[in-house]
Amino acid sequence: MAKKKEKKGAQGLKVVKGKLKIEPGKPAKVISSTQAFEVPLFRVFTDEVQEAGEEKPVRRDIIRHNGSVVILAVDDSKSKKDPLIVIERQYRHAAEQFLYEVPAGKVDDGEDRLAAAKRELIEETGFRAKKWTRLTRYFASPGFLGEWMQVFLAEGLTAGDAEPEADEKLEIYQVPLSEVLRLIDAGKIRDGKTLVSVMLYARLRKKKKRD
């Protein structure tokens, strides 16, 4: 097997030709950890840690979160070529604007992620799905937020009554995939989880057609 070819550039930069070997490495050594703040959704900690390659400990302010599930709900009953994607419109105070998003929600303490995804889809949209597939998972903003986002593909949809929480004001749409992609290209969809899930799904569809 041919070895990975690497060429060192300026300031230790490595230019990889071929496959990049993914090396997660070891976690930093936590010297101290103090909880600074807590609300129902998350907890804030100030940690003093010794990171690999560093001579002195550093301070890291981080948010601990149970993690979230993201649901890409797809209805291809009317069109296999251009299926409908469930999209929500809701106001996000942190962003100070209305955003168009796929359904998502927090995982409760001790809750299985698939069970959480099924619960959130029903609560927010009323839809139930016959087929569930794990697409990917990623960190939302790992510089300070320890939140995993688990993305599920939900297919074989059946409509029902939504059961949103009291503070959730949602408008629910079913939008053709081609239109969602057009809005992404135009910069009109600005929600990260929606960008990740829709663009990954579109890529997998293209790959499946080629295969």
Question: Locations of the language-model features?
Answer:
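Short loop segments at secondary-structure junctions
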Residues: 52-54, 75-79, 91, 154-159, ...
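Acidic, metal-coordinating catalytic segment for phosphate/diphosphate chemistry
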Residues: 32-72, 76
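Short beta-strand micro-motifs in enzyme catalytic cores
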Residues: 43-47, 98, 148-150, 171
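Unchanged
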Residues: 58, 69-70, 106-192
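Acidic pyrophosphate-coordinating catalytic loop
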Residues: 35-40, 93, 138-148, 206
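Nudix hydrolase/Nudix homology domain
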Residues: 2-28, 98, 109, 134, ...
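Conserved Nudix-box catalytic region and its N-terminal flanking loop in Nudix hydrolases
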Residues: 13, 20, 25, 60-65, ...
